[in-house]
């Protein structure tokens, strides 16, 4: 098992196209701050994390998938990025995390499932992006050619090489022909940007990715983070961990909140069955559940929540 991460540095794609991923919102700091914790957990749990300067996580996945195929192994890629569908093959399956009707689901793609869904082969997914671009990555594509037109063109002609070699012969509206001709350079640039690199300079020895036994520090690490449900799922006994005392057990005087005005901006909330505590402006306040209910329903106040499902049922 390999867990691939992006680095917060430019990649070879930025060198080819300076506007690559331009305008994308920065990753929220509350998420960024959790990456070191996640990586430490993965390390202690026996998994190998992989990062590569100048390359993206997709390139790492593509390189490892090809290496697995070449060594007569099968590969499963778990991702939320549709770009990885170009890596699907008889030996590589993609498990795509998606949301349907507000509920999460995992869709498994092999070549047959991919063709059933999109009517395209894995290599044709790259050609599709060459024409329609990708707004999320700021890949330009051909101006004026959307997903519907691009899908029709690739379904009939399979790749942009054929399209441009036969630009005067292909069966399209003249307006589409003009757009294709005008956007040729961007089409080829977009194909290059959208193609996952399968030769990133990383360790491809499959034996180095065998899951190792849990480190003895894993149990106390998880207990400190109060990952008790996950520990139970993993068969890790909480008794084996020296659990740090909860904040409520620390000798600390909690001041009762008297007025709503004491809570300003973003807050952190801790709740048990009978009471709650709020951290605001580096001060901890104790309050009753009726007050906390009003606080949590206040859309103006930003909250950070763990185990939201349990809280929402109360």
Over which residues does each language-model region extend?
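Short, active-site-adjacent cap segments at secondary-structure transitions
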Residues: 9-13, 57, 83-86, 276-277, ...
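Non-catalytic, usually N-terminal nucleic-acid engagement modules in DNA/RNA processing proteins
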Residues: 1-2, 6, 13
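A short beta-strand-to-loop transition that corresponds to the Sensor-1 phosphate-sensing loop
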Residues: 4-8, 79-82, 98, 305-309
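Long, highly charged low-complexity segments
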Residues: 207-302
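Extended two-metal-dependent nuclease catalytic cores across DNA- and RNA-processing enzymes
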Residues: 22-202
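Generic beta-sheet signal
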Residues: 1, 73-75, 266-268, 301-304
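Active-site-proximal helix-loop-helix substrate-binding element of RNase H-like nuclease domains
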Residues: 48, 101-129, 249-252, 273-314
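Glycine-rich loop at the start of a catalytic domain that most often binds anionic cofactors/ligands
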Residues: 14-19
